Amino acid sequence: MCLESDGVGTVSNSQGCIPGAEERGLETLPGRMNPTSLDVKAVELESSSSKPDKAYNWKRASVAAAGILSVGNVLNYLDRYTVAGVLLDIQQHFEVKDSGAGLLQTVFICSFMVAAPIFGYLGDRFNRKVILSSGIFFWSAITFSSSFIPKKYFWLLVLSRGLVGIGEASYSTIAPTIIGDLFTKNTRTLMLSVFYFAIPLGSGLGYITGSSVKQVAGDWRWALRVSPVLGVITGTLLLIFVPTAKRGHAEQLKGSSWIRDMRGLIKNRSYVFSSLATSTVSFATGALGMWIPLYLYRAQVVQKSVEPCNIPPCSTKDSLIFGAITCLTGFLGVIIGAGATKWCRRKTQRADPLVCAVGMLGSAIFICLVFVAAKSSIIAAYICIFAGETLLFSNWAITADMLMYVVIPTRRATAVALQSFTSHLLGDAGSPYLIGFISDLIQQSTTKSSLWEFLSLGYALMLCPFVVVLGGMFFLATALFFLEDREKAEKLEPCSDPFTVGNCSDSEEASIL
């Protein structure tokens, strides 16, 4: 060939050469090209054709990761509420009163909320899936060990629940932020709905697993040996299959100090009010989840439909029914909450906090009716529990999604940790013990009888619906500032798909599924 390149991709004839067919074959509309530039074009074309494959593989990996993270969340709550499923047996075995039994959950939550901000700080700065798996392995080992504690060492069981709380804090704090970075917009809402459905599902399975395993094995200790085995398996899968997701647009955002992050979150009014609302949800779910099965058992003793249990193993019927109701209402609540929010977004941009507020206020009505119905009809009480829990659970995924909307990516783990801390501090850290303490206080002022054991616990639990109404007010306050805070965060909100350039469209998100 008789061609020369000038070094920038244009080709000219050498002196004395006559253009031939080969040269004419390389002509293009804008001019001529040399073989080198053709190779570059071919490489670029090959790269662009492989880009959709990489994007598809990334999306599949993201969906799989969200599934594994959701399974891990199920196990966290299964382990947490296994104790509640065998609470009556624990009371009989260690010979503790209502306040002592409530202390198990209170110590767990206290250690959980203290550890949450620490893991939030670590989650914004270090490898998140390593922290998650380490936390799972830790609480699995502690839970398994606690099943061998002798009768005279109740304080060791209390201490072990505190250590389990530290391990589970790592998961609940960091896992939602990984999902928040893997998905955007409606897809993120869907994936967070699946993740937070794990809360009622795991809670219900905790009651069912605890009571069923105890019934089969004839010993409540075996109930504490199921979740650790599953935890080790899940922790291993998490290490292998969950990708190391980028923290939103963290590589292009300037890092900030922890103090600056905290100041930014405290000034975020939507975040503050939604965190206070979440605290009321935690208060109610912590108290009701701990005491409702025992309350309904005492109601049946008063109605003389069951005999009092003085020596374990005791009846597991109420724990099984309550666990099944919790699983079903959690599923319905998450679906109803996500569906109602999606529909209401067509009407108003403040749909998220408004749907939560309506759910809370409606839930308070049915929770009140539980204590009225339980005096005469257990079936009616279960119906009210079903309706109240469905409405109460409808806001979990929505609240998490609101946080992702109003908080910038580099602060999300810290935001989740701080929200977890405040919700537990003001919520279920004290509510199980507080309800037990009030119940004991009322019993001390009356004659000891099955009737007053039932009534005292019911009077104490009546605190819950009033707290739930307060939560509805906080969600209404969130609606006032939601749009302004979301707009501020969206200025720094990136597309979480590393293979997409520019903004993510809803059609692109839909292709993930």
Curated annotation (Swiss-Prot):
Its main location: membrane. GO terms for molecular function: sphingolipid transporter activity; transmembrane transporter activity. The keyword Transport applies. The keyword Transport applies. Pfam families: MFS_1. The chain crosses the membrane at residues 102-122, 130-150, 163-183, 190-210, 222-242, 276-296, 320-340, 354-374, 378-398, 422-442, 463-483. It catalyses: sphing-4-enine 1-phosphate(in) = sphing-4-enine 1-phosphate(out); sphinganine 1-phosphate(in) = sphinganine 1-phosphate(out). Belongs to the major facilitator superfamily. Spinster (TC 2.A.1.49) family. This is Sphingosine-1-phosphate transporter SPNS2.
